[in-house]
Swiss-Prot record:
It comes from the Archaea. InterPro entries: MJ1673-like_dom (IPR049811). The lineage of its organism: Archaea, Methanobacteriati, Methanobacteriota, Methanomada group, Methanococci. It comes from Methanocaldococcus jannaschii (strain ATCC 43067 / DSM 2661 / JAL-1 / JCM 10045 / NBRC 100440) (Methanococcus jannaschii). This is Uncharacterized protein MJ1673.
């Protein structure tokens, strides 16, 4: 059964875990080690080229992931783009979580307060262009 490696800055929700188990047949979820999670969650905005910055994350995937494992990739747009292409090159399956936004307006004391909730819908593959 495939594993799911997690390149994003949150914890999986119960809905995401259940969906991955049921529809993707994932049996194990692999979060990045703390130091790599810090890298992924803090991509520097002032660096022109982030290839060297992402190298430790790529090395982690090369060491631990096997072809047809899933990689959930969400975050900085440039880092996501690079890691999606890396995953495809390594015969991994890059995916992202789709969500439905539910907004509710509350009128109180002459003010409008909007509460937004995001509900997981499904995982979608990043497909090569």
């Amino acid at each position: 059964m495939p594993k799911m490696f997690l390149l994003f800055s949150h914890k999986l929700t119960d809905d995401q875990i259940n969906d991955a188990r049921k529809n993707l047949k994932v049996d194990e979820f692999i979060y990045l080690p703390k130091e790599l999670q810090e890298l992924w969650s803090n991509i520097p905005p002032d660096v022109d080229d982030i290839d060297n910055y992402l190298k430790p994350i790529k090395e982690f995937l090369e060491k631990h992931a096997k072809p047809n494992d899933y990689v959930l990739i969400q975050g900085d747009f440039g880092a996501t783009y690079k890691m999606v292409n890396f995953a495809i090159d390594k015969n991994l399956i890059p995916i992202y979580s789709t969500t439905k936004r539910i907004a509710k307006d509350i009128y109180k004391d002459g003010k409008i307060i909007t509460i937004r909730k995001f509900k997981h819908c499904r995982f979608r593959k990043y497909n090569p262009y």
